[in-house]
Amino acid sequence: MQNIQNFIAGQWISGDGPGQPLMHAITGEQFATVSSKGLDFQGMFDFARDKGNKSLRKMTFQERALMLKALALYLMDRKEKYYEVSYKTGATRVDSWVDIEGGIGNLFANASLRRKLPNQPFCIDGEYAPLSKEGSFIGQHILVPKLGVALHINAFNFPVWGMLEKVAVNLLAGMPAIVKPAAITSYLTEVVFRDIIESGLLPAGALQLVTGSAHNLIDFVNEQDVVTFTGSADTGRLLKRHENIIEHAVPFNMEADSLNCCILGSDAVFGTPEFDLFIKEVKREVTTKAGQKCTAIRRIIVPENMVEDVSYHLTEALSQVMIGDTKHKNVRMGALVGKGQVEEVKGKVVQLLKDSELVYGLDELILVGDNTQNGSFMGPVLLRATNTEADSRVHDIEAFGPVSTIIGYKDIDHAIELANRGKGSLVSSIVTYDDAIATQYTLGAAPYHGRIMVLNRDCAKESTGHGSPMPLLTHGGPGRAGGGEEMGGLRGIKHYMQRCAVQGSPTTLTEITQVYQPGGKYKEPSKHPFRLHFEELTVGDTLITHKRTITETDIVNFANVSWDHFYAHTDVTSLDGTIFTE
């Protein structure tokens, strides 16, 4: 029996007691236990702050980014091992690709941001602000790494991506992290985490891991720490109200599951490419990861006169999905993460049926594979709303599995109203070839959504899909979705850094920021700057030459010396028709 361990203060440690049993989602067999009982959580935070933080904040953005790139390459070389373990979660190869290579892709994406960052441990934020008449007193914002640790409390559905999409950002920002995956799939997180540590690429204390229950982890955070949470809205709200979070004003970034929707434009009737794209997109979002995605389509909002067409074609599409052992080449949908999750989803379906009717599903499953009878399987369920008003359960209850509800709308304004009745969602999409409809919907629904995807025939081939958050775009949403925001390229690192407004003379702020500030004193180097090596140059070095008139002969001579006859224009006729004159 495998024992899933925790990584604390540089050591792999097992928790006390028998631990929580971990079951194979496909076969239903127990293969491991996990426990975090008896761990020294205070010691974890102290080690992260004393060792990890001090090391990371001394590194420049360039060094941190290159560290991420090296780690991404290291993990990519070992990805097949992760796919094999991911099978136990009930995932197909495609499901696992999103989790594993999608997660590693976040490391690559954040590493690429080094092109926009200085070779310093900190950076400026925005333009300088002139604060005086003569220019002798100015202001400039800077971003410096916080002195604490990021505590990442993650969901069960993406044990690799959920970890890497967060740690890529905090490590680039110069802040260590304690990763707390959901226990039920922590075995996959542990496998990847072991390779991260064995790579030797990260300084001591940069990352630590708690695989079992979180217990009282939040009791140990302080005002220099950051807490991120991904999971159910109920649990997130409970943690957000924690006395320690409130007392120390600890930043709490919450990304909760939401009632995401996909809209079918009134122009996308049966027979158009957009109708086919809509059916394909909804089918994929219902079945990928067996519907266990925080971004999955929960509400299918279509014109009232197309409800029957959509119901028929979605039923046909879902009925063709083969379910079972994901090692079988024909299987397109695997198991839910555990039997408890199956029961919870079925319970939510019962509640949803009070405001809807069954279109497809809940039949006895025909599973592919010999050893699947004890697995955590559930087939796709398609409902049709009978009550679409604000008090309808379809706008309030989320079944976190392969379940979605069709809702009819009267016009685009009604579609916007229905979408916004989700009270805040991570993502919405609209499938239409009418840009006027797309514009009206986007502007009307944006206040209630963190991301909106517009899909049509022009972009479908390269579209990343409704359910895929991208590293360089923000991920999060208002209201029910948690009110948080993560990733988003350079926006993401700011959550782990302190913005400080610095005021003073331009010369002093030039030295502090290592960026020349308008009005700062010039420095005269001991010799011509062209004779200095790069490392000998300092910000503010200036060469003041005698005034002279540049002649055509000078330009011709320069072109001949540099062999630049393209940018150094020497032909007067090339100025014809331009705003320039001789």
Could you say what each language-model-derived stretch is?
Residues E80, G105, A109-N119, A129, ...:
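Non-catalytic terminal extensions of PLP-dependent enzymes
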